[in-house]
């Protein structure tokens, strides 16, 4: 079920989604930049970093909750990863409606979306859109 309808206004905020990442989430039998201090330092990083697609999944979850089936059946994204995220970061996906237009029997709602860390730094930025009922 979708939380948004076609009468959503430009400038409206999507409900944010937060997740506390931990090093344990990225553990495996192989030492990588995502789970091992020495491997991360060997690549010039200060420490292990989160797996980018796993962090971006916060945006996908936020969009699914906002658009419901309109995300599954017609969702679109374009994302840019701006910097590595420490593996122990608290990250929050946020979004703002930037436009809407009629598409078929519904409305395509376009949003600016991003993931930010607890200090407010945007680490992933982009756009997402989905279909909602109504005009």
Regions found by a protein language model. Name each.
Residues 1-13, 86-135:
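HotDog/MaoC-like acyl-thioester-processing domains
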Residues 1-2, 76-80:
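Short alpha-helix capping/helix-loop boundary micro-motifs
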Residues 1-72:
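Hot-dog-fold acyl-thioester-processing enzymes
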Residues 27, 75, 104-105:
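Sparse recognition of residues in long alpha-helices and their boundaries
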Residues 35-36, 42-44, 77, 86, ...:
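Short, surface-exposed, polar/charged, turn-prone segments marking secondary-structure boundaries
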Residues 20, 80, 129-131:
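Residues in well-ordered beta-strands of folded domains
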